[in-house]
Amino acid sequence: MLTLENVSLNYGSFTALNGVSLHAGQGELVVLLGANGAGKSSVFLTISGIHKAAGGSIRYGDKSLVGMKPSQIVANGVVQCPEGRKLFPGMSVLKNLMLGAYVHRGDGAANRQRLEEVMALFPILDQKKDDPAGSLSGGQQQMVAIGRALMGRPKVLLLDEPSLGLAPLVIKQTFEVIQRINQAGTTVLLAEQNAFAALKIAHRAYVIESGRIVMEGDRESLMNNEAVRRAYIGA
């Protein structure tokens, strides 16, 4: 469904991604594991069209995403929830959510239906829909960020470090929601440092270091890999 082949990315003279290849099939939940600065966000920003790949191919089904505008990529069904949430803190929860539907702004009925689905997934947001997003807790702000991405009607959802800055219980709840989104039919590509939480819900995973994919496998093989356990699970 989403396939990267030999993707490279440069920031000036610095090589951020070097020959990255990965695949997320229909209905899969695929994790991209890596330490801070390993290249996870660079992968997502390149898929989303924010950064221009220096080489390689990025395909969604039979379409090439290379050269598409970010809004076109969203309209085609590949939607990112960025690291750090990137909300507008002074705007209401509802307005933040509706920004995610911008590329579908001419389809009011479908947007209202989608909003109902998001509120059903995150009932607390319905209660706080008129509150400034910046007044919410970190976990609630992450709900807004995920909900905003869902308003874009993703077929492939890119989640960049959703556990960042959250308490352990909130991380558990967040990952349960991510699993529910996937089980409802959305393909998920999840970038995380929290290997223990991420691998528990993953079908497959890749490990990225210094802009290169250095390992891949199913959940069980990576959970039991000694190097992965030492580096990311602390065991």
Where are these predicted regions, by residue range?
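ABC ATPase C-loop
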Residues: A149-L150
